[in-house]
UniProtKB/Swiss-Prot annotation:
Condensation of UDP-2,3-diacylglucosamine and 2,3-diacylglucosamine-1-phosphate to form lipid A disaccharide, a precursor of lipid A, a phosphorylated glycolipid that anchors the lipopolysaccharide to the outer membrane of the cell. This is Lipid-A-disaccharide synthase. GO terms for cellular component: membrane. Pathway: Bacterial outer membrane biogenesis; LPS lipid A biosynthesis. GO terms for biological process: lipid A biosynthetic process. It catalyses: a lipid X + a UDP-2-N,3-O-bis[(3R)-3-hydroxyacyl]-alpha-D-glucosamine = a lipid A disaccharide + UDP + H(+). It is an enzyme of class 2 (transferase). Keywords: Glycosyltransferase, Lipid A biosynthesis, Lipid biosynthesis, Lipid metabolism, Transferase. The lineage of its organism: Bacteria, Pseudomonadati, Campylobacterota, Epsilonproteobacteria, Campylobacterales.
């Protein structure tokens, strides 16, 4: 019975992890940080957004780090997913503790956007690097392989045309995102109803919010929306979507749903990020679309969908994006993007795990 130490701090990483587990033998035992039984911590305990939030939770993060290093002694191999600020130092400490411990990094940090030096650290401390973006392999020397993209395993609904019956609203999975973006979505939805008549409005809520007081999280205006916990099905049925920056924007692009990306951070966090990261776009679909068109990812001139970031985000901007988007062009180009990513990744990662465990 192989024991795998998992560090999956993000909600999206845990969705990818669940798909991966379906491709692994049933006797694999998981320990560490993930959504499920026998976890040391739930990913919800790591729901941190912004530089000041990290400082406020530093004591907890250091404690969790130390516990994970100790827990690694029980593991046959280590699986790290995303969250590089936590996971790269973790890989370093585990490798120092046991140089023979096999470490896989799946969902690599975005070294193509900032902190390119992390690529050397990953190759030094990890044994296999599972890249989910075709272009990011070029930033590594030898240990990175393109394994496909996990969303192509997980998405079961793909549009055949741009028709849809609903408007979908996805204001994020963090309380701070919801507080900043949901009120703008509410106002846009109300104006659209005044201008175009009633359309079904669907609010997609993260599945891990089930059982929580949604009115306390979203406010009284949540009553204006139908509630869905199934993002993919809701996007498939939608005419258009309003989405907070994150994995959901790429999901919409792959499904074929026209959308606008909305994002607003704390002013200080945004200014720090602008100093560290040199990108024109923050949406994954736009970044991939640049690469697809042989442009520098995130810095190209081509754009698949509109982005409204920081002070550019407004109700007027959301309405303009809805009204002016060339949906026929968008749909055609979204099909190209799906072809570019080629295939899912779960089976390939499962095979590589078996190889590292000497089970093949």
């Amino acid at each position: 019975m192989p024991t795998i130490l998992v560090s999956a701090l993000e909600a999206s990483s845990n969705i990818h992890l669940e798909e991966l587990r379906q491709n692994l033998p049933k006797d694999y035992r998981f320990i560490g940080v993930f959504e499920g039984k026998n976890a040391l911590y739930s990913p919800r305990e790591f729901s941190i957004m912004g530089f000041r939030d990290v400082i406020g939770r530093l004591g907890f993060l250091l404690k969790a780090h130390k516990e994970m290093v100790q827990l690694a002694k029980q593991a046959d191999m280590v699986l790290l997913m995303d969250s590089s600020s936590f996971n790269i130092p973790l890989a370093k400490k585990i490798k120092k503790q046991d140089p023979h411990k096999k470490i896989m990094y799946y969902i690599l940090p975005q070294v193509w956007a900032w902190k390119k030096w992390r690529a050397k650290s990953l190759e030094k401390y990890c044994d296999f690097l599972g890249a989910i973006l075709p272009f990011e392999v070029g930033y590594y020397q030898k240990k990175a392989q393109y394994v496909g993209h996990p969303l192509l395993d997980e998405i079961k609904y793909y549009k055949k045309d741009i028709k849809g019956e609903t408007l979908v609203f996805m204001p994020g999975s963090r309380k701070s995102e919801i507080a900043k973006i949901f009120p703008l979505f509410v106002k846009a939805a109300q104006i659209l109803e005044q201008n175009e008549g009633f359309k079904r409005r669907v609010l997609v809520v993260p599945s891990f919010f089930k059982g929580l007081d949604l009115k306390a999280l979203y406010g009284e205006d949540i009553e204006l929306f139908e509630i869905s916990y199934d993002a993919h099905k809701s996007l498939f049925e939608a005419e258009f979507a309003f989405i907070c920056s994150g994995t959901a924007t790429l999901e919409a692009a792959l499904i074929g749903t026209p959308f606008v990306l909305a994002y607003r951070a704390k002013t200080m966090d945004f200014l720090i990020a602008r100093m560290l990261v040199n990108l024109h776009y923050i949406g994954l679909a736009n970044i991939f679309y640049n690469a697809l068109n042989d442009e520098t990812p995130g810095l190209g001139e081509s754009q698949l969908h509109p982005e409204l970031i920081q002070h550019f985000l407004s109700v007027e901007g959301l309405l303009k994006a809805y009204e002016e988007m060339d949906r026929e062009r968008y749909f055609k180009e979204s099909l190209r993007l799906r072809e570019y990513l080629a295939s899912g990744s779960a089976r390939k990662i499962a095979n590589e795990m078996a190889f590292l465990l000497n089970l093949t």
